[in-house]
Amino acid sequence: MKCPFCGQLDSKVVDSRPDKGGAAIRRRRECESCGKRFTTHERIEEVLPLVLKKDGRREPFDRLKLIAGIQKACEKRQVSRETIERLVDRLEARLPELGEKEVPSTTIGEWVMTELHDIDEVAYVRFASVYRSFKDVNEFMSELQDLLKK
């Protein structure tokens, strides 16, 4: 494993334990060159369905892209990185359960909105404003009205 501090490839594992939820292994490593320690996470590489975009393109599911989009919606909100990671873990676990080779991006977007609604309503509205591409203020206000009714 390449050391993030000095770039050398030799490191040794000094501690290894299951991550929360057991979906990954957290490893504490020590660089044999500079002696600094760093953490890595190892997870099973699953074959996930392709994401079918609104314009018809297909692309591989990108966990980091999804995390980045959710983080943007949660900016300056009391939503931790860990909460976002768990949200994406739940969504990622649902993908193989569909049993499909492709999943529409709209399905993933709706799942994110459902999760965000329960976590932080402001983040939900921010995500919805980008995801739903509101045409005007009236559409945006309609979404807010629906949120207030719930």
Swiss-Prot record:
GO biological process, one term: negative regulation of DNA-templated transcription
PROSITE patterns per the UniProt record, alphabetical: ATP_CONE (PS51161)
Domain of life where this protein originates: Bacteria
UniProt cross-references to PANTHER family, sorted A to Z: TRANSCRIPTIONAL REPRESSOR NRDR
Source organism per UniProt: Geobacter sulfurreducens (strain ATCC 51573 / DSM 12127 / PCA)
Keyword line: ATP-binding, DNA-binding, Metal-binding, Nucleotide-binding, Repressor, Transcription, Transcription regulation, Zinc, Zinc-finger
Cofactor(s) needed for function: Zn(2+)
Keyword DNA-binding: yes
Job of this protein: Negatively regulates transcription of bacterial ribonucleotide reductase nrd genes and operons by binding to NrdR-boxes.
Listed GO MF terms: ATP binding; double-stranded DNA binding; zinc ion binding
Name listed for the protein in its UniProt record: Transcriptional repressor NrdR
Leader peptide range in chain numbering: none
Cofactor notes: Binds 1 zinc ion.
Domain ATP-cone: 49-139
Lineage start: Bacteria, Pseudomonadati, Thermodesulfobacteriota, Desulfuromonadia, Geobacterales
InterPro entries the record matches: ATP-cone_dom (IPR005144), NrdR-like_N (IPR055173), RNR_NrdR-like (IPR003796)
ZnF (unnamed) intervals: 3-34
Family: Belongs to the NrdR family.
